[in-house]
Structure formats: structure tokens, C-alpha cells
């Protein structure tokens, strides 16, 4: 028993001596056993150093916590979007340019495009030739087209090869301003002898302002007059309720009337001056006077878009009456211009006249109609002027034009 007790005591002492000092929690300044030994505690790393003759733990160095390394997230590769194949815009089919009235009869569909194209080219390549313009608004009135000079400018360029006014005025007035407008017109016109001709009972009558504006509800017409000094005046009726009427706001009306002004100007200083300025229709076919002005208005308003020109021209084309070729032939070239009198109010001189002028323009450009007017002013007949311009006898062209209009109108 005594021997076992000694054995147990010996083992206990041996285990105590074998346990390392570092097993104790290190503390700055506390005794350690071996220089260079390290130990960690409370987030610090301590090193056993020699201080004098002693070995002690230093103050320790804080252990940096490792930054967490983000686990990369896999990004799915984008699915490529297929690039759509562009659908080619179909190129509009441009019809062959007509060179003769026979070409027109074979392919009337070429007329609208080439009349528009030749007008567009003329406007874009020319400069306006009038210089002095004044826009006058009556005291109790307004104006539907706020910037009429744009329309006058385009029409001036369309007919830049022809004489244009030295000075012209546009007078906008309502029914309330009727007397004021007539007085202003007579003051500016300043040609008493010609004014008496214009105001004769078989022509315009004594009151040009009232002709344009006969009542408050019907004050939306317009009319030009030109004196022998080349001064032109356009009277424009004003009805504010017509602000949504496109033809009165987009320049069409102004271009129509300025075409008349240029027609007038061809008679200034001409052999037929007095009667021609008193009434163009004394010499020029009525359908050419009004149809030519309708064409000038639409072509000058829409040189930038064949589609808009096409839409606008339908106002005339769709209102052409359905008649046979014989009726149209007599309408175009009647025995007497008195036959046109009943057709003024019903519109044929505008609608049929537009179609004929469009045909002229498709063949020879926008100046064709005005050159006929100019030659008539100089004393030529319609037959002579037409043949000079087109190289074809008028009587040969009339039946072709009549057949074309009758055939095309029958399709609508």
C-alpha cells in the first residue's frame, strides 16, 4: 500500500511539470518561459520577450479579422436578341413622263405626278419677283391666314418667268367693315377710268367689297383687281367661324388669288389692257382663268408633298361632273363664251378647268397656262396661243382632252 501511494504522487508531479506555461492566459507583463514564444488571447497575439533579466509577455498586437470573401454569383450570359431584318420601304413607282396629248390619253395616271413634280421643281429653283406687299386688316376684322406672305411667295416663284405686280395689297375685312373696305379699295386702286369699267352693271357692279362679302354669314370669298400702273389689290372676306376651313387658313386661297393677280399682270400695258383688266374672262377661257388659279393654289401650297397635293386635288377631281366626251368638248371650246355663264355657280369652270390645267402642266410645266394668257393679252387667239405653246393645233387637242376627262370621270 505504501509503495502504491508513492507511485501515484510521482505521476502527479510528472504531469504538473510537463504542462506548458503558455497554457495559462497570456497577459502583458506576465512571466513567460521562452523568448519568441507566441500565444493568443482576447483577439491579440502576444510574444514572449526578454525585459531586463526576465522573460515577459509583450503588450500584444490586435489580430485583424479576415475580411469575408464574397462568393461570386454566377451571372447568366444574356441571350442575344435577334436583329430584325428591316423591311424595305417600297419605292413609289414613278410613271413615265408624258410628252404628248397621245401619251396623256394612253396613261392619264402620269398627269398628277408630273404636274406636281414640275411645279415643285419650279418653286424650288426660283425666287419671288414681287417686292412691295402690304397686308391690311380692317378695324373690326381679323385674318384667318396669319402669314399670307408665305403663299404669295410660293406662287410668285411658281410663275417667276412672268410679269408680277409692282405693288400689291391684301385687305381682310368682315361684313361690319364693308363700307370701310370699299373706300380703302377705291383709294388704293387710284385708276378712276378703269374703276368705272370694273363697276359697270355688266361686270362687277358698284361695290367690289360687297361682291366678296354679301352677308355676315357669306363673308368668305375673295377677289383681285389690278390697275393700269400694275398695282394689285386682293379683297378677302373674313368670317371667324370658318377658322377650321383648311383652304382659307393654309394659303390655298391666297395662292389662288395671287395666280389671278399674275394673270391680270399679263394685260398691263398690253394691246388688250382695258377690257382685260376689267375682266380677264373677256378674252381668256373661263375654265383657264378659274381652273388655272385653282391649280396654282394647290400646287403652291403643297410643293413639299405629293401625297398632300394628291389629297387636295381630289376636291376638284371628284367634283368634275359625269358627262360624255361630246359635252366636255363643247365645254372646253364653245362657240361663244356666253355658254360658260350658267356654269360659274355650279363649279365646272373650276373643276374641269383644274383638270385641263393639270394636263397642260404635266406636259409643259406650270408656265404653260400663264404663257397662253400672256399671248392672248398680246392679241393672239386661244388657238394661236395654244399651238405656239404646245406645237399642236388646239382643235386637235380638244377631243383628246375631252375623251380623257370623260373616261377618267366615269371610273369615279
Can you say where each PLM-predicted feature lies in the sequence?
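Secretory targeting and sorting signals
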Residues: 2-23
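Extracellular mucin-like PTS domains
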Residues: 68-92
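Non-catalytic architectural context of zinc metalloproteases
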Residues: 88-247, 251-252, 282, 344, ...
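Beta/coil-rich, acidic/histidine-enriched accessory regions frequently appended to metallopeptidases
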Residues: 100-107, 150, 374, 378-412
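Zinc-dependent metallopeptidase catalytic helix centered on the HExxH motif
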Residues: 210-316
Amino acid at each position: 500500500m505504501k509503495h502504491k501511494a508513492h507511485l501515484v504522487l510521482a505521476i502527479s508531479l510528472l504531469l504538473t511539470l510537463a504542462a506548458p506555461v503558455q497554457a495559462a492566459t497570456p497577459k502583458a507583463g506576465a512571466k513567460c518561459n521562452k523568448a519568441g514564444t507566441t500565444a493568443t488571447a482576447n483577439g491579440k497575439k502576444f510574444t514572449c520577450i526578454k525585459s531586463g533579466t526576465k522573460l515577459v509577455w509583450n503588450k500584444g498586437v490586435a489580430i485583424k479579422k479576415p475580411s469575408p470573401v464574397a462568393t461570386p454569383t454566377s451571372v447568366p450570359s444574356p441571350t442575344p436578341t435577334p436583329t430584325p431584318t428591316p423591311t424595305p420601304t417600297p419605292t413609289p413607282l414613278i410613271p413615265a413622263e408624258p410628252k404628248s396629248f397621245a401619251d396623256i390619253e394612253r396613261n392619264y395616271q402620269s398627269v398628277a405626278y408630273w404636274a406636281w413634280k414640275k411645279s415643285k421643281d419650279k418653286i424650288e429653283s426660283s425666287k419671288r419677283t414681287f417686292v412691295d406687299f402690304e397686308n391690311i386688316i380692317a378695324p373690326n376684322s381679323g385674318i384667318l391666314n396669319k402669314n399670307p406672305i408665305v403663299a404669295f411667295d410660293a406662287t410668285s416663284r411658281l410663275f417667276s418667268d412672268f410679269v408680277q405686280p409692282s405693288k400689291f395689297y391684301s385687305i381682310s375685312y368682315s361684313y361690319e367693315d364693308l363700307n370701310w373696305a370699299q373706300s380703302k379699295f377705291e383709294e388704293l386702286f387710284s385708276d378712276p377710268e378703269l374703276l368705272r369699267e370694273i363697276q359697270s352693271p355688266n361686270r362687277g357692279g358698284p361695290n367690289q367689297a360687297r361682291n366678296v362679302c354679301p352677308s355676315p354669314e357669306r363673308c368668305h370669298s375673295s377677289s383681285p383687281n389690278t390697275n393700269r400702273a400694275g398695282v394689285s389689290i386682293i379683297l378677302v372676306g373674313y368670317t371667324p367661324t370658318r377658322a377650321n376651313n383648311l383652304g382659307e387658313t393654309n394659303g390655298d386661297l391666297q395662292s389662288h388669288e395671287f395666280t389671278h393677280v399674275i394673270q391680270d399682270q399679263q394685260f398691263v400695258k398690253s394691246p388688250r389692257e382695258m377690257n382685260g383688266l376689267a375682266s380677264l374672262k373677256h378674252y381668256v377661257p373661263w375654265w383657264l382663268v378659274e381652273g388655272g388659279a385653282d391649280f396654282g393654289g394647290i400646287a403652291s401650297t403643297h410643293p413639299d408633298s405629293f401625297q398632300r397635293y394628291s389629297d387636295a386635288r381630289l376636291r376638284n377631281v371628284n367634283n368634275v361632273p359625269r358627262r360624255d366626251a361630246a359635252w366636255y368638248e363643247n365645254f372646253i371650246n364653245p362657240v361663244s363664251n356666253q355658254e360658260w355663264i350658267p356654269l360659274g355657280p355650279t363649279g365646272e369652270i373650276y373643276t374641269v378647268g383644274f383638270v385641263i390645267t393639270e394636263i397642260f402642266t404635266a406636259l409643259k410645266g406650270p408656265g404653260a397656262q400663264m404663257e397662253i394668257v400672256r399671248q392672248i393679252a398680246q392679241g393672239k387667239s386661244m388657238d394661236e396661243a395654244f399651238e405656239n405653246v404646245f406645237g399642236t393645233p388646239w382643235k386637235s387637242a380638244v377631243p383628246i382632252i375631252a375623251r380623257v376627262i370623260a373616261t377618267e370621270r366615269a371610273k369615279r
